[in-house]
Amino acid sequence: MTWQELLASRGIAIPQKPEDTINKRVVVNPELSQKEKTFSLNIELDEDQNTAVQLALAGKSFCLIGKAGTGKTTTEREIVKAILSRMNGRTHIFRIQGTGEKVESPAAAVVSYTRVAAGNSRNAICKDEELRNAFFHNVTTIHNLLEYAPVFFYDDEKEKESMRFIPQRNALNPLNVQTIAIEESSMVDLNLWDRLYDAMLSGTQVIFIGDINQLPPVFGPSILNYALVQLPIVELRTVYRQKFDSLVLTNAHNILEGKEVEEGPDFKIIEGGTKQHGQTVTMLQLAGSLKRWYESGEYKPDEDIILSPFNKGDLGSDSINSHVAQFLNDGDVYEVIAGIRKLYVAVGDKIMFQKQVGRIINIKHNPMYAGKIPKPHSKHLSRFGVMLEEDDLDSLEDDGLAHVEYNLEAMSKEDMEELTHQASHVVEIELETGELLALRKAGELSAQNFSLAYALTVHKAQGCEWRKVILVLHKDHSILAFNELLYTAVTRAAKQVVIVGKKFMVAKAIATRRIKGDSLKEKVEYFNANLAQSHISCV
């Protein structure tokens, strides 16, 4: 039986026009046993979920779309089981995330843009013991699947050795993977898709999983936009998560439908009075509130997250991180100089390194550093680089940084390059995966790679979930106050949402859409009109 015949037997039409790609009716064969339908005896899939599993079994590329709480993760887990049932012994050599070691595993992968999203997918999929044993290392980031690695080259323009990361998997060294499912595919930009597409063998099945209502990539459209106008679409329409007993999920759907949000114990809007203050005053008020909530147990830094539309400004995630760290951690603060950047961090700080959350476990002098001497570490040094109280200078340690001397004339050009790339300290971290890293180079501690993680931008938070989300929404954030951002922020919360901002800003965000259209059909038509002249292929 061909896949077209199989799909026809299930009542699934293969579309010719974008508006026909969305599943409208599914006919499930009543003769199929529960096990055959779901590949799991304790889960019963609905019609839309069953459609997705049958498409996966048929080897057909398609899009799996669903709003918050519609069972995408459950469906994804059953899809993986279906895919494994037809592998016929085909395998691929995967690189293990973090260690670089190689492992042979079935020739299918579930990939995400970030490590955090990949970790969440891995935890969800591998709740099933069978999948944990067979598929653990198959759930990874796109970059790791493509085996990105540093390559050194001579930059003629800069007249020096340089380094960049490039994928080791490409058209000349392709992936021997039969099926690739892309989780949170709305986050994947076209450049990264090009690299992945280049490394795929002809005929590779690709399943695009995502929520079209979330934020698109920072730069340009996502590959999901293109997939939606080229491939069959299965839209999950039944809400399961929390069964609407929480205002978090109720309001997430209210936001999508352009309705006013409801307030209650698990969804609060704190306006802070009638007057609209500037960012500086609002930040001081927020810091005071966060400290009180922390002391009362309402704010738990290990379980909760503070989100902001921006990373810069007094109410950006960088500033919020500094304020929160100031009252959370009273240990010695170190001024770490990393190129032109100065960080003020302490042992125990919650951090994010390359989009993965962890903790600082040690900070020590970097003997390779030969730059400007940083301030001595002290519990009186603030997170903004200001000494709050007079310290006994004789008691302060200088970490030996003042005593580093090098015979520069005797050093090779390579050694000089290595020397200039060093940070003032070695920052040792432990990631949530248990991976231990020692960050000593300025690039490793750059703003792109390293930050405190009490607060994040909404973009960086995609693919993650916390107990409580505290969203800061100020009038100065108006340029980014749109429906997709508010929806993305709200759906990061499992239990409670607290919006710190004026209600008119919430209303503005609900009413403003970056992606035109209320329904999936209208959004697909919008994408089709805007992408008609492109030559991006998803199959």
Describe each region flagged by the PLM.
Residues 26-33, 39, 50-70, 76-79, ...:
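Conserved helicase motor core of P-loop NTPases
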Residues 4-5, 9-33, 468-539:
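Helicase C-terminal subdomain and adjacent C-terminal extension
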Residues 183-184, 210:
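Walker B catalytic acidic pair
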Residues 353-500:
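Conserved helicase C-terminal RecA-like lobe
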